[in-house]
From Swiss-Prot:
Protein name in the entry: Desulfo-A47934 sulfotransferase
Recorded consequence of changing S98A: 60% decrease in activity
Quaternary structure note: Homodimer.
N-terminal signal peptide: none
Associated pathway: Antibiotic biosynthesis
GO molecular function (one): sulfotransferase activity
Gene: staL
Taxonomic lineage of the native organism: Bacteria, Bacillati, Actinomycetota, Actinomycetes, Kitasatosporales
Length: 270
């Protein structure tokens, strides 16, 4: 199968993990360094930053990841050549908490945590974070790659994958992705999962730092690079920031907004 195959996800949804497993599956080898993930399943934003971009009409299958919403102008070049989309979706509650950890903000710094939570709830996503660009709000991103995807990519087939299901049954869910993308048979799926556990990815991240290779962790003002790979926490309470934060988030989940709609649709309206 020729054409563009997108691994689309909102930031902090587990995209690096899925890309690592796909890279290991395709190559049949462990991913030894952080740049190996980018080499295996490139992130479009990283390519654009380096002045590169895939062909708009590839004569082979191309796996490409992005946090962009599907309707971003830069993606119009791939309108006709996009064949498949894997949309990776994570509980927005946990994505928000993952951002706090990524920024090196401990739960004890309640004021800083509250600021991120209040902004996330108000924006329904990360638009004010200024780490990424073009990702839109959480519901905008999901809608663009699922319900509205054919407005941007009329020929695309779509597979939605929940991060939580990938954590619960990584072999089963990775096989669904591999089969959907027509990458090959089931042989190699178990090895790809074993090669990309969170522990292995932490080791890979640290090894890459020691080798002076680029990783994704943010830099502190003191020049220390924070770890990118966390523990993949799920369904954590927001009450450590105050009952008002938990209530504000609950109100967002149970409103009549697109955020509430997609939270209900994917099982996050707890």
């Amino acid at each position: 199968m020729n054409g563009m195959c997108w691994i689309a996800s909102y930031p902090k949804a587990g995209g690096h993990w899925l890309r690592c497993m796909l890279t290991s599956y395709v190559t049949g080898e462990p991913v030894e360094t952080w740049p190996g993930i980018q080499a295996g399943v490139p992130h479009l934003e990283g390519l654009l930053r380096d002045g590169e971009a895939p062909s708009a009409d590839p004569d082979e299958q191309v796996l490409l990841a992005t946090h962009f919403t599907a309707d971003r102008p830069v993606l119009r070049f791939y309108r006709e050549s996009t064949a498949k989309v894997v949309c990776l979706i994570r509980n927005p509650r946990d994505a928000m908490l993952s951002l706090m950890r990524m920024k090196g903000i401990p739960p004890e710094d309640v004021e800083a945590c509250r600021k991120i939570a209040e902004t996330f709830i108000a924006d329904e996503g990360f638009s004010s974070v200024r780490i990424w660009a073009g990702e839109g709000s959480w519901p905008e991103n999901i809608r663009s790659w699922t319900d509205s995807v054919h407005e941007s990519f009329p020929n695309a087939a779509v597979l939605a994958v929940r991060y939580e299901d990938l954590r619960k049954d990584p072999e089963g869910e990775l096989w669904k992705v591999v089969d959907f993308l027509e990458l090959g048979g089931r042989d190699g799926v178990a090895d790809a999962v074993a090669n990309c556990t969170l522990e292995r990815m932490r080791e890979m991240e640290e090894r890459s730092k020691l080798l002076g290779l680029e990783t994704t962790g943010l830099m502190t003002r003191g020049g220390k690079q924070l770890p990118f790979v966390g523990k993949g926490g799920q369904r954590k309470s927001l009450k450590f920031m105050g009952d008002d934060i938990e209530k504000a988030y609950a109100d967002l989940l149970h409103g009549e907004t697109d955020f509430a709609h997609y939270a209900r649709l994917y099982g996050y309206a707890e």
